């Protein structure tokens, strides 16, 4: 998500097998049998130093409003979260509510409540549709959209103005004209900072692919090597070979590659996370005049951002459903939820919190980008393996001897094994 969290973690197939086995052994009970629970366990990831103080305060106010009810909090850093959750699952010590960046394997194993079983109709309807869809498995929503980042294109206003552009390019044709003009400027500017390295090359490629009218999956089928995908990677290769990027973009990552170049005022345009301090602190400190927008589109594609989200989820346990529901409804009250997002510096997944956060003129333009978010197919079991291969090999396609169609064909074969 941002530098405050880890990327999507691997080992999902093993988790799925484990949870399925536990379910077969009766490790998950119903939510209404055995009497109503008076205490639940909440396990959350630590995003910043403000994580625990926020939850401590929220729980204190919740317990004051619900006498006799208790919420036991456990905060775990991202580096240890998945392994500790694995242990909880293996020993059948399931949390009642969990915050993590995966959910589909637990849903597949029958360990989770559906979203409509643990939040009110009002909360369920408040989730932004694209985030709710991305929290669904096999036609039902199990994950509760928790926090979001959206990614798109930042541009250096000064460089674009020098090149004769008062606004960022909106189409591929305008983009081609812009990078050509920037390259012709004195000063050795990099027209576009392209990061196709292992850190997040799939994010950048996927964003350009959607801007070209393609996607990883279309109509329920994998289209990794579809015509629009191939055209996109060929476009990025041409961009590279024509000298419109920094050297060796196939091995370039964002944090130590394109982002520092942008902060130094050397790059015209770059892919980055909207509002993330890991990117903007250095940019603001350097006094770079910048704007943020969606990537230029082709073939009339709808402008979009790349969305990434983490989830809350509720595990089925005897007697816990009512208290879980009360607590989650309390957390998702607009004021409570918006306060959390402000503490962590993250973006909303609900309409009500979006409305509140738009009152901040610095945050409002970024919040408006959330509704444009499109997502990677993270609920597909093969995605973890596919993304790992893409991360390792995608960058080779834009080298002098790279073959975009061949490399995407290899990725397609991996996807279709699912």
Question: Where are the predicted features?
Answer:
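Extracytoplasmic/periplasmic solute-binding protein
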Residues: 142-146, 151, 173-223, 267
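Conserved C-terminal helix/tail region of periplasmic/extracytoplasmic solute-binding proteins
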Residues: 161-162, 368-418
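Hinge/lid segment of periplasmic solute-binding proteins
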Residues: 101-150, 204, 211, 289-293, ...
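Extracytoplasmic/periplasmic substrate-recognition and gating elements
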Residues: 60, 64, 163, 238-245, ...
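Glycine-centered hinge/linker elements that transmit conformational signals in sensory
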Residues: 179-180, 221-250
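A structural signal for short loop-to-beta-strand junctions that line the ligand-binding cleft
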Residues: 95-96, 123-160, 302-303, 373-380
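Long, aromatic- and glycine/proline-rich binding clefts that accommodate carbohydrate-like moieties
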Residues: 134, 293, 341-389
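Extracytoplasmic "Venus flytrap"/periplasmic binding protein-like
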Residues: 60-127, 136, 161-170, 261, ...
């Amino acid at each position: 998500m941002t530098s405050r969290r880890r990327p999507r973690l691997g080992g999902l197939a093993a988790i799925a097998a484990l949870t399925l086995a536990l379910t077969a052994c009766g490790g998950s009970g119903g939510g209404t049998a055995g009497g109503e629970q008076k205490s639940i366990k909440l396990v959350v990831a630590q995003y910043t130093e403000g994580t625990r103080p926020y939850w401590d305060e929220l729980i204190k106010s919740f317990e004051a409003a619900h006498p006799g009810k208790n919420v036991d909090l456990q905060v775990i850093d991202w580096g240890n979260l998945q392994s500790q959750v694995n242990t909880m699952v293996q020993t059948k010590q399931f949390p009642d509510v969990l915050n993590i960046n995966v959910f589909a394997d637990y849903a597949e194993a029958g360990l989770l409540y559906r979203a409509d079983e643990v939040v009110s109709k009002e909360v369920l309807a408040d989730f932004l549709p694209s985030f709710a869809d991305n929290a669904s498995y096999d036609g039902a929503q199990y994950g509760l959209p928790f926090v979001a980042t959206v990614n798109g294109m930042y541009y250096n206003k000064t460089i674009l103005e020098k090149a004769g552009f008062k606004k960022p390019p909106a189409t591929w044709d305008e983009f081609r004209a812009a990078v050509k003009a920037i390259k012709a400027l004195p000063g050795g500017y990099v027209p576009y900072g392209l990061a196709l390295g292992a850190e997040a090359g799939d994010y950048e490629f996927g964003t350009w692919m959607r801007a070209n009218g393609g996607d990883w999956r279309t109509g329920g089928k994998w289209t990794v090597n579809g015509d629009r995908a191939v055209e996109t990677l060929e476009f990025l290769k041409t961009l590279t070979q024509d000298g419109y990027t920094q050297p060796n973009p196939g091995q370039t990552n964002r944090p130590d590659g394109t982002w520092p170049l942008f902060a130094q005022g050397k790059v015209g345009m770059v892919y980055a996370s909207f509002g993330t301090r890991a990117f903007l602190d250095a940019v603001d400190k350097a006094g770079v005049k910048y704007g943020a927008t969606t990537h230029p589109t082709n073939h009339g594609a709808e402008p979009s951002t790349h969305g990434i989200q983490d989830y809350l989820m509720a595990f089925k346990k005897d007697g816990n459903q009512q208290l879980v529901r009360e607590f989650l409804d309390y957390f998702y009250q607009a004021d409570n939820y918006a306060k959390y997002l402000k503490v962590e510096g993250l973006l909303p997944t609900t309409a009500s919190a979006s409305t509140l956060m738009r009152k901040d003129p610095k945050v409002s333009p970024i919040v408006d980008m959330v509704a444009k978010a499109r997502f990677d197919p993270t609920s597909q079991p093969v995605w973890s393996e596919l993304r790992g291969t893409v991360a390792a090999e995608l960058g080779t396609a834009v080298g002098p001897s790279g073959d975009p169609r061949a490399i995407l064909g290899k990725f397609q074969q991996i996807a279709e094994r699912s």
